[in-house]
Regions:
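Glycine-centered hinge/linker elements that transmit conformational signals in sensory
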Residues: 169-174, 208-239, 277
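Extracytoplasmic "Venus flytrap"
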Residues: 29-47, 370-371
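Extracytoplasmic "Venus flytrap"/periplasmic binding protein-like
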Residues: 29-31, 47-116, 151-154, 252-253, ...
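Hinge/lid segment of periplasmic solute-binding proteins
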Residues: 88-140, 168, 273-275, 427-429
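Short, solvent-exposed loop/beta-turn-alpha elements that line the ligand-binding surface or hinge
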Residues: 106-116, 159-160, 202-221, 266-267, ...
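C-terminal lobe and pocket-closing loops
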Residues: 263-269, 281-381, 414-429
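Extracytoplasmic/periplasmic solute-binding protein
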Residues: 128-137, 141, 165-211, 217
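C-terminal capping/gating helix-and-loop segments adjacent to ligand/active sites or protein-protein/ligand interfaces
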Residues: 38, 60, 236, 349-405
Length: 429
């Protein structure tokens, strides 16, 4: 997918917000429920900055699993409190069969001048003939490089086109010359390391996320990644957001979601480069993150929800969103010359990632419902067993593939890119 076609709340608080609705007048704020921009500082930026000038809105956030449960409960009870929902493509897909989404072709028609790529609008149909969500914002995962690391690049290596072997060699050179392991990954409890394994590492070696989980190529991949991990800062197992170790100088080369490195780039833009993740034998895989806006079936304020979609997709709002929270426009919005250097770096990094000649697209998992956490755990458990505990690669892959098969059979989720389309549950060979 080319650049042109791409790109918690606490349950008690959420419950209180909803239970109060019965006694509030029709003039109350509409409820905008989102799985995105959940951290406290990001949610506050949405309320104070991004929603400025929009219809009066209560912005409520929740984790993906409770979000799905909440939406299902409202449908089953036929008692609707939520007007607008914001979530990832793969989180919106399961809402379709439960009848939780209202078709919004009328809203799509009013957005034709926004320049949202046709490919993204097609994704928003969720495989139907009707528009079910409007693309909201996009992001991906990148590598951030402190320029202090550049003198230690392996001979002949291009920082914008690295391989995993070169990354390991680079890390080894930095370790030998500085006495510290300078590579870093967010393997902490709230880190997004599972997305690295799913979206970057696995498809780069196997052209698959599920089907080839225990393949010979996967075995090679894990052995190669052991060499990368050997040069990674041991504190990586406690890192959640890589911007902190980057700013502290503990790590010079880090992988993470663009929103989780933004502060480091904003603080010292002249110190860093943002580059595409490394490539493996099957290409340079990356995971685009597409968030969408959908109107809930039975929305108490459908008109207000449509107006809020119009506000959030205005070019100026999209640029504010990029500047404030590091998610990039889906509309045709030219990045201004006065854009902060840190955000400009991120924009360049996203472009390098999406337009690499060997780019491979790996979509976020789709159709897993409340099994998404278990799916992620398969990858992290495999990493812990093979890399951290040094268990045999082949035996571990065989055992973990059984766990993966159980999850896919339970969810009946068909394959998604880069795996080939399947009839029924995505198979694990």
């Amino acid at each position: 997918m080319r650049k042109s076609v791409l790109l918690t709340g606490v349950a008690a608080v959420f419950t209180l917000a909803l239970t109060g609705m019965a006694t509030v007048s029709k003039a109350q704020d509409l409820i905008f429920l989102s799985t995105q921009l959940r951290p406290i500082d990001e949610a506050q930026k949405v309320r104070d900055v991004i929603l400025k000038g929009a219809p009066k809105t209560s912005y409520v956030v929740d984790e993906p699993s409770p979000f799905t449960v909440r939406m299902k409960a409202e449908v089953e009870a036929n008692k609707h409190t939520i007007s607008l929902v914001g979530a990832l493509h793969g989180e919106l897909q399961p809402l379709l069969p439960m009848g939780a989404l209202d078709p919004i072709d009328d809203v799509a028609a009013s957005l034709k001048d926004r320049g949202i790529p046709a490919g993204l609008m097609e994704l928003g149909k969720l495989g139907t003939g009707k528009q079910m969500y409007i693309p909201w914002m996009q992001a991906t995962y990148v590598m951030v490089v402190n320029k202090k690391a550049l003198p230690f690049l392996p001979a002949g290596a291009d920082v914008n086109a690295l391989t995993y072997q070169q990354l390991a060699e680079w890390g080894k050179a930095m370790n030998e010359k500085t006495g510290q392991r300078r590579l870093g990954f967010p393997v902490g409890p709230k880190g997004l390391f599972a997305r690295f394994l799913q979206g970057n590492l696995y498809p780069s070696y196997t052209a698959s996320m599920v089907t080839e989980y225990r393949s010979a190529e996967a075995e090679t991949m894990w052995n190669d990644f052991k060499a990368v991990w050997a040069q990674s800062n041991p504190n990586s197992t406690s890192y959640d957001f890589m911007q902190e170790p980057l700013m502290a100088g503990e790590v010079w080369v880090a992988w993470d979601h663009i929103a989780r490195v933004k502060d480091a780039l904003q603080q010292a833009p002249n110190d860093y480069l943002v580059v595409a993740p490394p490539a493996g034998p099957k290409g340079r895989s990356y995971m685009p993150v597409i968030a969408g806006l959908a109107i809930a079936k039975g929305a108490p304020d459908r008109k207000g929800a449509a107006e809020l979609i119009m506000h959030l997709t205005k070019p100026e709002t999209q640029l504010v969103t990029a500047s404030e929270v590091g998610f990039f426009p889906v509309v045709n919005a030219t990045l201004p010359a006065n854009l902060s250097p840190g955000v400009k770096l991120l924009a360049e990094g996203v472009a390098k990632t999406q337009t690499a000649k060997d780019a491979v697209v790996a979509l976020l998992p789709i159709g897993l419902g409340d099994k998404g956490g278990e799916f992620n755990k398969v990858y992290v458990d495999t990493f812990q067993r093979i890399v951290l505990r040094n268990e045999p690669v082949r035996a571990t892959l065989d055992a973990q593939a059984d766990v993966m098969r159980t999850i896919m059979a339970a969810t009946k989720a068909p394959c998604w890119a880069p795996d080939k389309a399947s009839e029924g549950a995505c198979p694990v060979k």
